[in-house]
């Protein structure tokens, strides 16, 4: 049968998806369970949604949504590991650009991924708009409720706290940093309690 893939990107390769769909489809596409295919494909790091459709007589079309890495985990000088918002390691497709992807410095990739503070940081980072992600120069995740992003080399420092109430926190940050009357000559915005933001 024919299997086609729509929506792969430089972090989730078409061949990865084809491999899994092919294993699931086995000999007969007619007998394949869309549900099983979707479930398996969603397990690929970076895939946020998967839809499998049979096209008779013997084709299968898999449509995926693939996200960019939530962050790059940096260990040592040159070692970068891409991870998605769920803390799953992405296999970079060669030539993938890491530009605009926030970097978190960690001692060890495996350990950090089981760490609550890194998990919270990934949730926050993956939810931020591209424009903000592009200008993040440093991410600190000392504890799970003190996630901080530094923008443009410290021109703005945003303390998010944890990933709760993110929508509200993002709205508050947006309002503060884009209003010269509010931010003035200050640099630090703490929205860990979004209803009582602290600007210093």
Question: Where are the regions a protein language model picked out?
Answer:
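Extracytoplasmic/luminal low-complexity segments enriched in Pro/Gly and acidic/polar residues
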Residues: 154-200
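Periplasmic polypeptide-binding modules associated with outer-membrane biogenesis and secretion
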Residues: 1-11, 28-79, 83, 119-123
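Solvent-exposed coil/turn segments that connect beta secondary-structure elements
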Residues: 8-10, 55-57, 65-69, 76-78, ...
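Periplasmic/extracytosolic POTRA-like scaffold domains at the N-termini of outer-membrane
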Residues: 6-45, 98, 102-116, 179
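Envelope-exposed proteins and targeting segments
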Residues: 1, 13, 33, 37, ...
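Soluble extracytoplasmic domains of inner/organellar membrane proteins
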Residues: 113-168
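Solvent-exposed, non-transmembrane alpha-helical starts
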Residues: 28-30, 71-74, 110-116, 159-161, ...
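Extracytoplasmic segments of membrane-associated envelope/inner-membrane machinery
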Residues: 61-136
């Amino acid at each position: 049968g024919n299997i086609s893939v729509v929506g792969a990107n430089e972090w989730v390769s078409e061949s990865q998806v084809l491999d899994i769909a092919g294993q699931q489809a086995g000999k007969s596409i007619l007998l394949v369970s869309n549900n099983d295919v979707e479930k398996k494909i969603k397990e690929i790091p970076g895939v946020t949604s998967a839809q499998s459709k049979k096209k008779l007589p013997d084709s299968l079309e898999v449509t995926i949504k693939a996200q960019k890495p939530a962050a790059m985990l940096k260990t040592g000088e040159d070692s970068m590991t891409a991870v998605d918002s769920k803390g799953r390691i992405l296999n970079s497709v060669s030539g993938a650009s890491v530009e605009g992807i926030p970097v978190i410095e960690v001692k060890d990739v495996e350990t950090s991924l089981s760490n609550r503070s890194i998990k919270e940081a990934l949730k926050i980072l993956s939810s931020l708009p591209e424009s903000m992600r592009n200008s993040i120069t440093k991410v600190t995740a000392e504890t799970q409720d003190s996630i901080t992003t530094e923008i443009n080399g410290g021109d703005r420092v945003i303390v998010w706290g944890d990933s709760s109430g993110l929508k509200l926190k993002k709205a508050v940050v947006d309002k503060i940093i884009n209003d010269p009357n509010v931010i003035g000559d200050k640099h630090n915005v703490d929205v860990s309690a979004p209803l009582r933001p602290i600007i210093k």
